[in-house]
Amino acid sequence: MPLINSSFAPGQAQATVDAFQDPDQRQIAQAELYYFSGRAQECRNIAELYLQDKDLCLRLSAGLLYSFSNLTLGNPSASRMGFRNIQECLRLAEENSASEEVIASCVFAGYLATVLMHLPADGLPPLKDFLPYLPAGIRAYAIYILAHNAYLNEEYERALGLCQSVFLMLDGCYPIAMEYLYCVIIMCLN
C-alpha cells in the first residue's frame, strides 16, 4: 500500500502517486487513490492485474484493494477471492522464509481484512509483534486497525490511547492513516 505509506500534504495525493518512480508501485498507489476517492471500478481494474504478481507486497496490496473495491461494487464472491489471496501470501511468505518486513506486511494485510470485515483473526500471529518491521505510514495504519479492533471489543480507552500514541510517533503527515485514526477517536468519544 504505497500511498498509505506515503507522507504528503493534504491535497497532494495525485502528485504523490505521480512521483513514484517504480511503475508498479505507481499503479498500485493509483488504485489506492481511486479506492479512497470512491472510484471502486477503476481501483478494481488496476488491482486485478497484480493479484498473482511475484512481488508479495504488490500482491498483498492488490488483494486488499480488489477485495474492498469488489465489496463496494456488490461482488462478494470476487471479494472473497481477494481475501483468500491475502491468506495465500502469508502462507507463501512463511514457507519461503521471507524477510520479517514481508511477513509483517502479510500479517498487517490479514488483520486489515479480518478486523474491517468484523471477522476473527484466527490463525494470524499478533499484529503488535510485527509493528517494528512495518514502515511508518503502514505502521500508523496498522495501529488504526488495532484501535478499530479495540473499539469493536468496547475497549474505548485502549482505542483512544492507541490512536493518540500514533500522533506522538509520526515523523510527517500521513493523511490516509490520520483520517482513519481520527474516525476511531470520534467513534470512541460518542
Each language-model region and where it sits:
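Residue-level detector of the short coil/turn that links helix A to helix B
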Residues: F8, G38, G74-S77, M117-H118, ...
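Single-residue signature of alpha-solenoid repeat helices
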Residues: A13, C43, S79-G82, G123, ...
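TPR-adjacent "capping" and linker segments in tetratricopeptide-repeat scaffold/adaptor proteins
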Residues: Q14-D24, L131-P135
